[in-house]
Structure formats: structure tokens, C-alpha cells
A protein has these predicted regions:
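Nucleotide/phosphate-binding catalytic cleft detector across ATP-hydrolyzing
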Residues: 1-165, 173-290, 296-402
Length: 402
């Protein structure tokens, strides 16, 4: 990578984050999705303080398998922060990982939030990202990001409907002319499906399973409408004997286990339709609704929703990444602060490398900014250090920054 590319990459470190209950996705401006890892942190408490051992993929492998002094936890619950300190450490880890550990990476961050989150919950997300090293944090509502990522025409004078089924929440929204006409956040989603599967196995088979096993069942054989006689072997602990046990379950089992969760989602969709103005309702009859999020990958969920609502139901092309992609697109159209000043002031080059013939012209041509070379580029750093020592106000400012 050339010098100019490195400089441009530092300038383009703004990030969009889909901070999900189950997974966190990061989009870097101009680079697309660069990180997709579980929102899991492994910690150990020493001297009353939490010390992070692992984050993301590595931490998820520890869920339910850690010794007593180590905890593998999800710091977000129902789409909002449940543990501020651990969330801060998780965001900090992801920022460093994306920017290769550069200590000076202080990106501007756009984070999506559930529509039902309170002002206190939203401030907690902003504060956590700022404490993790962001220089500025802005928020976007999750269904808007999902709709943008799914390429729905939300800026037009027609109705668009999206149902984003994440880990902690299901976001239901109707949009038109770039705004939300109706929105509702249901705290039933992927995690609730896993919990329902755990409860079903305990009740019907006297088998205790963990959340990870429940998630595997959902992905392998889970369905909203059973269509065949497939079976799946489930291993767990027999509640009567306490010994390991294996049972075979069918699609009928999973459909029954998930029935109540899916019914709650359908009722939420019907509430949205009843609250939608008649003019937009007519659009939805033709346009239907679009499903995004990991929960939309449940087999036959589109068929069940269509059958019970009477609307066409479409699954987005990349449902797992829709929110992150939409947040990234919104970031591309959000002008960075001070950009107007930089257009006028330009950038100033110092150091011996700035004496390379025409380097200012090359940088100006490729950035569109005025580029100035300092009067004494070789001595700028030394002169500035001397001024900081002589000027108490500057010296105090420098100290306060570090």
C-alpha cells in the first residue's frame, strides 16, 4: 500500500456498526462489511474488576463451557446495553481489530438502535462508543437502516414495510417519504426462539439443552410450517437420571416449539397494518413486506407470515447484513464534521517527506483539497514541541489530551 493510500485510509476510518444482541457487524466507509462477530465477551473478575479475556468468535466458543472464575456473557439484551463496561470493552476491541490496533484510530461512528429504545438506553449506547474511542457518535433507527440495506424505496411517496428479526428484538416499521409512518419494537426474536426450544425440549422430552444447542436445532431443522418428516438428533442431559441422553426430533416439534413466538410476530405485523393510513395500505398490498435479520432465515417463515397477513412476503437478498449495509449507506451520505473548513483551509504537510517534488500537487489532485507545505517542514515538530514547553496553556492542553 502506497503512502497516499495509507493517508486516505486513515482519513476514511469512519464506521457504521450494527450493534446486535447476537452479532455485531462493522462497515468501514468505502470498504463494506469488514467484521461480523458474535456480541459475546469472556471476562474474569480479579480484585473486584472485570478483565476481558476474549471477544467475539473466540468468546462465543466459551459460552456454557467456562470454569467458575470465567464468564462468557452477552453485554446487550433485547437490543440495548445490559452491561455498560463490558459493552465499552467490546466496541473498543472491534474498533482496534478493524483498524489493526492503531492507537490513533478515533472514528466517527454511526450505530443503529431499536425504535423502542428509550432516551436513556440510546445515551448509554452513545456514551459506550465514545468511551471506546469514537470521536463522534450518531444513531440511526434499525428498521430505517434495514430498509436502506434491502434497497426499499423509502424516500418515495409509496409505502414500504420491513420486519427485521434480530437476536433480541423484531423491528416492524412502515415507511414513506424517508420517514417512519409506524414503528414498533417487539422483544421477541431469535433469542426468544432459542429459549422456546429449550423449554419445549425440557417439557416434552425431559431433556436439558443449552442455548447453543437450541440455536443449532433452529438452524438445522427449525421451521415455521412443517413440510417433511426430517429428524434431527439432539443431545443433552436427562432431567430424571442426570445422565447424557440423545433424542430424535422432527420438524413438527420445532414448529410447535416456535408457534407462540411466531404468533406474537404475526400479531405485531397485523397491529402495524391496522395503524397504517389507507393510502399506504394499498401500496403494501402490491409491495408486500420485506424480512431482514437472522430470524428471517427460519424455514418457511415467509410462507407463514404471508398466509396469516394476506400480503406478499419477501426475504431480502442478504438478510444477515441488511442493517449493517444500510447503516453504512447512511454513513456515506452523512457529511463529516469540519469538512467545510477543510475545503477552505486544506491540509498542511510537514516532515522531510513533504519536500518530495510535486507531492503537494499529487495529494491535492487526488483529495480535492488545497495542500500547503509548511515554511520549515523539517523543523516543525521540534519547533512545536518547544512552543508547547514555553506556552503553559498549550502545554496544559497537550497534557489533558493524554
Amino acid at each position: 500500500m502506497g503512502l497516499f493510500d495509507k493517508i486516505k485510509k486513515v482519513w476514511s476510518q469512519d464506521m457504521a456498526i450494527d450493534l446486535g444482541t447476537a452479532n455485531t457487524l462493522v462497515v468501514v466507509k468505502g470498504q463494506g462489511v469488514v467484521l461480523n462477530e458474535p456480541s459475546v465477551v469472556a471476562i474474569v473478575e480479579q480484585g473486584g474488576k472485570k478483565q476481558v479475556l476474549a471477544v467475539g468468535d473466540e468468546a462465543k466458543t466459551m459460552l456454557g463451557r467456562t470454569p467458575g472464575n470465567i464468564q462468557a456473557i452477552r453485554p446487550l439484551r433485547d437490543g440495548v446495553i445490559a452491561d455498560f463496561i463490558v459493552t465499552e470493552e467490546m466496541i473498543k476491541h472491534f474498533i482496534k481489530k478493524v483498524h489493526k490496533g492503531r492507537s490513533f484510530a478515533n472514528p466517527r461512528i454511526l450505530i443503529c438502535v431499536p425504535t423502542g429504545s428509550t432516551p436513556v438506553e440510546r445515551k448509554a449506547i452513545q456514551d459506550s462508543a465514545l468511551a471506546a474511542g469514537a470521536r463522534r457518535v450518531q444513531l440511526i433507527e434499525e428498521p430505517i437502516a434495514a430498509a436502506i440495506g434491502a434497497n426499499l424505496p423509502i424516500s418515495e411517496a409509496t409505502g414500504s414495510m420491513v420486519v427485521d428479526i434480530g437476536g433480541g428484538t423484531s423491528e416492524i416499521a412502515v415507511m414513506s417519504l424517508g420517514g417512519l409512518v409506524y414503528s414498533k419494537s417487539l422483544r421477541v426474536a431469535g433469542d426468544a426462539m432459542d429459549g422456546a426450544m429449550v423449554n419445549y425440549m425440557r417439557k416434552e422430552y425431559n431433556l436439558m439443552i443449552g442455548d447453543s444447542t437450541a440455536e443449532k436445532i433452529k438452524k438445522e431443522i427449525g421451521t415455521a410450517i412443517p413440510t417433511n418428516n426430517n429428524t434431527y438428533a439432539v443431545k443433552g442431559r436427562d432431567l430424571r437420571s442426570g445422565t447424557p441422553k440423545e433424542v430424535n426430533i422432527t420438524e413438527e416439534d420445532t414448529a410447535e416449539a416456535l408457534n407462540e413466538i411466531l404468533r406474537d410476530m404475526v400479531n405485531g405485523i397485523k397491529d402495524a397494518l391496522e395503524s397504517t393510513p389507507p393510502e399506504l395500505s394499498a401500496d403494501l398490498v402490491d409491495m408486500g413486506l420485506t424480512l431482514t435479520g437472522g430470524g428471517s432465515l427460519l424455514k418457511n417463515i415467509d410462507k407463514r407470515f404471508s398466509k396469516e397477513t394476506g400480503l406478499p412476503v419477501h426475504i431480502a437478498d442478504d438478510p444477515l447484513s441488511c442493517v449493517a449495509i444500510g447503516t453504512g449507506k447512511a454513513l456515506e451520505n452523512t457529511p463529516p464534521e469540519l469538512s467545510a473548513d477543510l475545503v477552505d483551509m486544506g491540509l498542511t504537510m510537514t516532515g522531510g517527506g513533504s519536500l518530495l517534488k510535486n507531492i503537494d500537487k499529487r495529494f491535492s489532485k487526488e483529495t480535492g483539497l488545497p495542500v500547503n507545505i509548511a515554511d520549515d517542514p523539517l523543523s516543525c515538530v521540534a519547533i512545536g514541541t518547544g512552543k508547547a514547553l514555553d506556552d503553559q496553556e498549550i502545554f496544559s492542553t497537550v497534557l489533558s489530551e493524554y
